[in-house]
Amino acid sequence: MKVRSAGGDGDALCVTEEDLAGDDEDMPTFPCTQKGRPGPRCSRCQKNLSLHTSVRILYLFLALLLVAVAVLASLVFRKVDSLSEDISLTQSIYDKKLVLMQKNLQGLDPKALNNCSFCHEAGQLGPEIRKLQEELEGIQKLLLAQEVQLDQTLQAQEVLSTTSRQISQEMGSCSFSIHQVNQSLGLFLAQVRGWQATTAGLDLSLKDLTQECYDVKAAVHQINFTVGQTSEWIHGIQRKTDEETLTLQKIVTDWQNYTRLFSGLRTTSTKTGEAVKNIQATLGASSQRISQNSESMHDLVLQVMGLQLQLDNISSFLDDHEENMHDLQYHTHYAQNRTVERFESLEGRMASHEIEIGTIFTNINATDNHVHSMLKYLDDVRLSCTLGFHTHAEELYYLNKSVSIMLGTTDLLRERFSLLSARLDLNVRNLSMIVEEMKAVDTQHGEILRNVTILRGAPGPPGPRGFKGDMGVKGPVGGRGPKGDPGSLGPLGPQGPQGQPGEAGPVGERGPVGPRGFPGLKGSKGSFGTGGPRGQPGPKGDIGPPGPEGPPGSPGPSGPQGKPGIAGKTGSPGQRGAMGPKGEPGIQGPPGLPGPPGPPGSQSFY
């Protein structure tokens, strides 16, 4: 199928069946449905209705134009028929009058000889000549009225020619509108291809989004795995710290026991200070034991200090680890919020993209159906316009032919009128010559009657007819009289038979491009179509710029109560207080063991 202009030149070729078939293969068809039934108020139906109404208006306009042309043609034919009948009637009347005048003039001589009333008849010739002049003036008035009617017919012919030109211009505008429709179809096809490209880009972006979702899920899974490992590591560290706290508590209890022992030893040493001299051997052993115990206590103190340093290091490490855990929890919570927000935004974008794709598919389907219907309808309109154009061309050809025939008949009528005027001039000159001759004869008769006696004899027989005199010299042409009043219109004559159709004339030149028409009304929005199938994921896109810093979050709930901390270091011994009052003497203890023998004393030499 090819869409051409109405002019028949074939220059406005725009859309072919192959292109439409290719477009049908590329574009999926989605019916304009609404819950399983066709939509009652789709844009395609409204556009079809508006197009039908516009075409009906165009047909009505063409029908009115044809009726007007037919009425004008009938009026022209009636006027021409009435003119021809009036001219034929006037011609026949004047022919009859001229024949009668010739007969009367031929019968003047015998009447003048036979009857004496010839003078009276000669006296009546003056008013008859005046009547003839009046009739000639009436003929001139009729001819002037006929000229006016001829001018009116020429004006009607000009009106018909202008209407034919307007029809040709309208046909040119129709061809131009068809060309514009072809251009708009090309633009629609380009838009459809652009929509296909955008759908392909959207499919690629959806693929990228799904790939990013998979990557985010993998990252979240990895973060959860690392969080589990760190939690297990923290539990192990907590177990070790618990064990170390237990050992430290044991060491502290041992240290407290030792301090109690030392305090008891001090009390015993004070109590046994008086008996030191007696138990020197036990004191040496006890001093050795005390030195050993002090060394062991010094070692224990050093071990306790090392353990305290280790515990300080462990506590600082635990604090750092706890801070790292808090940071990691904060980052994980922030990442989870960001992922949730991104997933929500992605879901919103996906929903909006699905809605847009659905609307795009519905629009593509509607435009496809509308374009197909427009092409079919434009093809029908083109055929009807070409048929109407051919019929109009034939009618205009017949009308031009009839106008040319009418012009030929008017030329013939003018020639016949000129011949009639020449004949009338010749007859008037002959009449003037006859009148002059009759005046001369009248003068002769008057002289004869003067010389004749009163007695009157019987009239003699009529004499023979005289010879016709020579033609006189042609007189000067008289001035044109004033324009007479237009005569009344005669009765309409019967319509003549229709002539044979003539040969088809050559194809006329293409008219100028008409003005651009007014833009049509905007159609209503179509209903949403069914969603299309899900596309393949596209390639991964570039990393976007970091978003703006969000507002500070709301304070979180208070955490659970922590475990009791490790006991702090033992403080330095305070200042020695004032000595208290002397206590009561205690119970005398049992006698001690006998001490070892003392060293031998030195011998004095007094």
Swiss-Prot record:
Annotated Low complexity bias: 485-519
UniProt KW Membrane keyword: yes
Region feature (Disordered): 454-606
Cited InterPro entries: Collagen (IPR008160), Oxidative_Scav/Glycosyltrans (IPR052376)
Keywords, ordered alphabetically: Collagen, Endoplasmic reticulum, Glycoprotein, Golgi apparatus, Membrane, Repeat, Signal-anchor, Transmembrane, Transmembrane helix
Signal found in the keyword field: no
GO cellular component terms, A-Z: collagen trimer; endoplasmic reticulum; endoplasmic reticulum membrane; Golgi membrane
Residue ranges with Gly residues bias: 526-535
Protein name, as recorded: Scavenger receptor class A member 3
Organism: Homo sapiens (Human)
Gene assigned in the entry: SCARA3
